[in-house]
Amino acid sequence: MQSLKLSEIVINWYKKNLRILPWRPKDFDLKIDPYIVFLSEFMLQQTTVKTVVPYFINFLKKYPTIEILAKAKLDDVLAIWSGLGYYRRANNLYKSAKIITNELNGVIPNNYEDLIKLPGIGDYTAAAICAIAFDKKVVVIDGNIERVISRLFELDLRGNDLKKKVREILFLNVPGKENSLFTQGLMDIGATICKPKIINCERCPLSENCRVAFKNSAINYPLKIIKEKKIKRTGNFYCLINSKKEILFLRNTNLGLFENMHVLPSDGWLKDNHNLDFNIFSINERFDCGVIKHSFTHFDLDSKVILLKLDDNQIKLKDNCIFIKPENLDMFSIPTLYHKIVKLVLKNI
């Protein structure tokens, strides 16, 4: 397919059939707010559009500009992010907002080289912001785009070899103007027509040029990578409750998983356990509440949940500890895993 023809077909289709999403302007003539694209791309990392939409709307209402976000308290940012998962993104979004506001005069970089220097921004996110927010002539490859191109050209490749070939093809097809529309158009074709398991070739604007259109073999592309089986981890979570039925949480100061968030004491499942010195408490009763199961990107977790009822007169809290009422959990930066644990514990009180 000639370079110009592919971009023309996709752009013309997109202008008539784009998905209505809260981070997209309703009018193609309207100037795109880079902050809106910046925020949406952080949220869309490893998360579906359907899941992101309500979180994006709520987040943007509270933090409508990058300056307001940079001035916010990290705890508040993490709290409104709670439930979306992959919490390191929220920490990195906040760090990047601080850098942009304090060091770059509040101006989001419009080039790949400067964007990729910011916390939490890798190759894909930098390219996506450049293309969508600033209409730069860069190649963007997400799962949808990779699937569309692999089927369009019937690429019998997988993994890095596939990505390299897709990049070569797109490099020859990226238009000098309206790359923002071209990129989003390819994404939308993949998301609405050329899906992983459902393919609607009748509706696809590229079907006349697609090498696997209307063929049963289309669903086999892109060729699958054999994934390693997830490892299983086990451990213990401790739910300490006082007479007011408030639950003890720790502020996690460890880097990595659940950084800067409120967590329950635990051991056995992480290298850096969320430890607590139980000797500072007088424990009246102990109950085994059962097992909690939770899936992470690289491992599955099966852990015991232990309820400890405390003697209020013997409680001396450290600075990183706080008692929280179950009905107030949403006011704090508490990951979904711990909401599940509390729900299990409350059944045993």
Question: What is the predicted function of each stretch?
Answer:
Residues M1-P25, A191-I349:
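Intrinsically disordered, low-complexity, charged terminal extensions of DNA damage-control enzymes
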